[in-house]
Structure formats: structure tokens, C-alpha cells
Amino acid sequence: MRNAEVSRNTLETKIAVAINLDGTGVSKLNSGVGFFDHMLDQIARHGMMDISVECQGDLHIDAHHTVEDVGIALGQAFSRALGDKKGIRRYAHAYVPLDEALSRVVLDISGRPGLEFNVEFTRARIGEFDVDLVREFFQGFVNHAALTLHVDNLRGKNAHHQAETIFKAFGRALRAAVELDPRMVGIMPSTKGSL
């Protein structure tokens, strides 16, 4: 099974995460930030990955450190669970609509961290959640999972719908990219021979 656990403890957060890339979409989430847990659940359900997150963060300041550090820890766990990357499809994309909103996520499990994030949220907050933190989560994940990620919200009027389509599309693209290709068993999906 492709799974991993990561603990990350700093002066700002104490985090324990676990991920199973070949799961059934089950999640156990306690970041202390309700909307963020709702978004992480989208990754698990649409990515068919089992994800567990337990976090105690400095929420008396704001949610920035919590969201960013969960992204870092999940990225580390994802990378460990993926292992040597042999046999995976590597590239994937997904479009996801939710009513008026439509987002596209394209990714490459390349070994090269890179984030292109083109989202203009229609408001600054979703409830108490600062929409700037969506990008912070993905930057943390990308840096530590070592993947190239393009996120584009193509349209949307409701900020909740914009965010939800992004996280759903991310989960679906991850699921497709980590899928084992029966024609690539034991083969590195790169002409370089490594990722």
C-alpha cells in the first residue's frame, strides 16, 4: 500500500497527518478551521485517498500557519507515500463545475515544485476563512510534494463555489496522476530515468 504518516511540530503548529493514496476517500480532519476541513474533505473524497489531519495551531492569531503547515505536512506525506514514482501516470488534469463556478487543475508529478495560481476570488473571506490561504495551502503542498501545479478558476461568482471547485479538481487530478498504469509497471515515467 502507498501510505505515509508525517508529524510536524513548530512553535506555531503541532500537526500529525496520514495519507493512503489507494484509499476509499475516507477522511478524519481536525485542523481547527471548519471551512478548511471541508476543503480537505474534497481532496480525500474526489481523490479517493484516505486522509487524516490533526492540528493544533496558533488560531488565536489567525489560520495562516495552520493552513500553510498542513499543506507542508500533507505534501511531505504525499511524497513519501508515492515512493519512487515508477509506474504512475504522472500527468493529469481535471475540470470541475459547481453551479456557476468552473475550475481547472493541471499537474505533473515532476520532482520540480512549481505553482501557477490564477484565481480571482469574488470576496476576501468565506465565513471566517481568508481566501488568500487557499494559495498558501497549495504552495506548501507543492513545495514538499515536488510537483508542478496549475490552478485556474475559469469563472465563478460565489467564492465558496470557486474554492470548492478548485479543491475537488485538485483531488481528481491527483487521483489520476498517481494511478498505476499497467503498461508502465516498474518503469519511471520520464525519459531522464528519474523524477
From Swiss-Prot:
GO cellular component, one term: cytoplasm
Superkingdom of source: Bacteria
Location of this chain's protein in the cell: Cytoplasm
Membrane-spanning segments: none
InterPro entries tied to this protein: IGPD_sf (IPR038494), ImidazoleglycerolP_deHydtase (IPR000807), ImidazoleglycerP_deHydtase_CS (IPR020565), Ribosomal_Su5_D2-typ_SF (IPR020568)
Gene: hisB
Listed Pfam families: IGPD
KW Lyase (keyword) present: yes
Official protein name in the record: Imidazoleglycerol-phosphate dehydratase
Record keywords, A-Z: Amino-acid biosynthesis, Cytoplasm, Histidine biosynthesis, Lyase
Reactions performed catalytically: D-erythro-1-(imidazol-4-yl)glycerol 3-phosphate = 3-(imidazol-4-yl)-2-oxopropyl phosphate + H2O
GO molecular function, one term: imidazoleglycerol-phosphate dehydratase activity
Similarity remark: Belongs to the imidazoleglycerol-phosphate dehydratase family.
UniProt entry tagged with the keyword Cytoplasm: yes
Gene Ontology biological process terms, A to Z: L-histidine biosynthetic process
Enzyme Commission number(s) of this protein: 4.2.1.19
Organism per entry: Aminomonas aminovorus
